[in-house]
């Protein structure tokens, strides 16, 4: 031992030691024990590259020096993975008692079960985030499309509003012009009407139409004959009506013609004297022209009415 030390010391004396300022300081390589037990957050970094089938590495105990030289890789079986998936669906959080129970049932170490649950939660969160991102992305795209369509509709409506405003302005100008023209026409008409009224007022008033006071005797006679019918219509005597030949002779005799002329003259004289007016009410003279009295009104005093002349 002394020789070895002496030899080593003697060799170290011959070897030159050079200190270069340009060399970078190299950090010491981390030990296995320091990497494994540096903290609880290092588990996620160590198992990020594990496969989805649940492969795990058996790193052995801490105090065994031979574990770093010969690392054995273990893979979980299909049945073990299915059982762990079912338990994860029930509850993704693993308690210590549940961890030990699952390890005993599946033939695994509790640390392996804990690591599998941790990795599975990380993948589940990633998938959940991806699903949420997809939903949000689809909603965003739909909202963007709706916003674009609404923007287009808004632009079209704004254009229509501008067109309507322009039309309203044009129609307003036309309406103002038309109103001005109508007012001018009305003013001209009122001026013309006033001028006509003034002209009529300056003119001399025209005399009223002349109404003739003297009417022809023929018209008066016709009116009297229309008021007083023929005497034959008022005869109610059965003795006179029985003698038809006497009636015919009476109508066509020359005395009858003279009597008719006398009656016409009498009616003309009565009309000129004002005995009967044109506005006599027939209701007041109903008894005057009823029966034999109507027949005797003119015939009693006439010579031709006597039956002795005809009998002789």
Curated annotation (Swiss-Prot):
InterPro entries: HD (IPR001356), HDZip_class_I_plant (IPR045224), Homeobox_CS (IPR017970), Homeodomain-like_sf (IPR009057), HTH_motif (IPR000047), Leu_zip_homeo (IPR003106). Residues 129-164 are annotated as: Leucine-zipper. This is Homeobox-leucine zipper protein ATHB-5. Widely expressed. Keywords: DNA-binding, Homeobox, Nucleus, Transcription, Transcription regulation. Residues 69-128 bind DNA. Belongs to the HD-ZIP homeobox family. Class I subfamily. It is found in: Nucleus. GO terms for biological process: abscisic acid-activated signaling pathway; positive regulation of DNA-templated transcription; response to abscisic acid. One of its GO terms (cellular component) is nucleus. Pfam families: HALZ, Homeodomain. The keyword Glycosyltransferase does not apply. CDD domains: homeodomain. Its main location: nucleus. Induction: Down-regulated by abscisic acid (ABA) and by salt stress. Probable transcription factor that acts as a positive regulator of ABA-responsiveness, mediating the inhibitory effect of ABA on growth during seedling establishment. Binds to the DNA sequence 5'-CAATNATTG-3'. Residues 1-33 are annotated as: Disordered. It comes from Arabidopsis thaliana. Residues 23-33 have a biased composition (Polar residues). GO terms for molecular function: DNA-binding transcription factor activity; DNA-binding transcription factor activity, RNA polymerase II-specific; protein homodimerization activity; sequence-specific DNA binding; transcription cis-regulatory region binding. Interacts with DNA as homodimer.
